[in-house]
Amino acid sequence: MKILKLDKFDQIGIIVRDIERSSKYLGNLLDFKDKLQLVEQTNTVLYKGKEVTFKMKKIMQNFGGKQFEVIELIESNGDHLYSEFIKDGKEGIHHLGIYTKEADELIENFKNEYDIRVIQTGKYGKVKFVYLDTIDLLGFYIELISF
């Protein structure tokens, strides 16, 4: 079996406690081509096999050829990757996202070769996302994103 490796990332995901404060500094410190847009979004995901719904504020902006995603959790009816990150007292880089059409092959490869498992899955519109449990190995999660 050929061992698959990721050759790029497309998104950097950051969790913050106060997105309004963060967006002010991001807009002043980084040269975004467009004005930062703050939106609210509700998602339902499967986290460790349990369905959870949560609401968040987020910024999705292109920067330096990558998608820059900044997230503030507003409310939740259970635990998930974002709430656990915040409960652990963390703020900052949460995940690297990879756009792929080979999510199933990558998931199988990482499971077989490295015992890396899926920890959270979800869908938003036509976008499917799968988080791999790499936090203890890499210090952040890997998110596989397919359209």
Predicted regions and their residues:
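Function-critical acidic carboxylates
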Residues: 73
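Signature of short aromatic-glycine-proline-rich micro-motifs recurring in repeat-based ectodomains
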Residues: 54-58
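Short loop/beta submotifs within extracellular cysteine-rich repeat domains
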Residues: 34, 77-79, 137-140
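A cross-kingdom feature marking solvent-exposed beta-strand/loop segments within repeated
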Residues: 38-49, 53, 76-88, 93, ...
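Long, hydrophobic N-terminal alpha-helical segment
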Residues: 1-47
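Vicinal oxygen chelate
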Residues: 1-3, 9-17, 59-69, 83-102, 107-147
